[in-house]
A protein has these predicted regions:
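Charged, amphipathic alpha-helical segments and their flanking helix caps
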Residues: 1-23, 27-28, 42-133
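A short, hydrophobic beta-strand-centered structural micro-motif
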Residues: 33-44
Length: 133
């Protein structure tokens, strides 16, 4: 697999709930009563693993956005964690999710300025393959 876009689309499909792939997410949530799930392809990191083998790490971020109050934040943080954990050890497009990272869990600035929860989890998918001679 060498198509991070295909992986992002696979993650969005796995999420369901109207999740969509976006390359420059910026949303106006005025009037939005339900949550919005956005998948962003972040990048690919490649490095030698062993003789004649390469390790590729594909990184994809999932954003959960929702209008909310501060009282709603604990449950929304828990939901972001549940989403991330649901992908651990799971295969999407033939790649296995080996790591989830929540740094930060959400954006305090968005909460203060927009009354919007923006939580992000970064998924790392791993593949090891033989290099061409």
């Amino acid at each position: 697999m060498d198509d991070i876009i295909e992986l992002a689309e696979g993650v969005a499909e796995s999420l369901g709930e109207g999740a969509e792939v976006s390359f420059a997410p910026e949303f106006d949530l005025k009037g939005l009563k339900t949550k919005k799930l956005v998948v962003v392809p972040v990048g690919i990191e490649s490095k030698p693993n062993a003789r004649d083998y390469l390790e590729d790490r594909y990184k994809v971020q999932i954003g959960l956005l929702k209008k909310c109050t501060e009282d709603d934040v604990p449950e929304l943080v828990r939901e972001v964690v549940r989403i991330g954990r649901s992908f651990l050890q799971k295969y999407v497009c033939g790649l296995r999710c080996m790591k989830t990272e929540y740094v930060p869990h959400f954006s305090p600035e968005h909460l203060r300025e927009r009354r919007q929860f923006t939580g992000v989890v970064e998924l790392t998918f791993l593949t090891v393959h033989r290099t061409e001679p």
